[in-house]
Amino acid sequence: MTVKPEQAQPKPNAKSDILFIACGALAKETKAIIDRYGWSVELKALPAVYHMTPLKITTNLDVMLEKLKGQYERIIVVYGECGAAGIDAVLDRHEVVRVKGPHCYEMYAGADQFGRLMNDEPGTFFLTDWLLRAYEKAVLRGLGLDKHPELAPLYFSHYRRLVYLSQAPTEILIKKAQTI
């Protein structure tokens, strides 16, 4: 489901005038919402691993939006701010909107619940289904902890609590979350 920005060209007879561009970490849930409500919406997703280098989010969104210019009546971006400085400026330049929220954790928990979680413990590390499934690649290898486990305290010492925001929990994901 994820595409490279240069592959973003829609089919010549696109079935929808509306496109959602989602983060790969939100694509499965975005597709489920589209299907649940029977929306006539096309969905494209950028790789979730771009979060490891957030500049890739803004750069690749910009490239994708430029390639798709004039192809859709409306484009909605399903991304938070995600540490990607300038994402809103890119979207403004292309006259595109995004869903509200600083990151997917707030989208999954809801603004009120997320606010309570952060007020209760600002040092909270959040896990999602995607992050659990990709933990080894995105966190351990992505942060170099597979080769330098001694760096873990530098990355995680300020976290005091872990919250798993499950979208479609399985016994395997729950057990994995409990081991982290």
Regions found by a protein language model. Name each.
Residues 40-57:
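A short beta-strand-loop structural module common to alpha/beta enzyme folds
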Residues 21-28, 50-51, 76-88, 102-105, ...:
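Gly/Ser/Thr-rich loops at beta-strand to alpha-helix junctions
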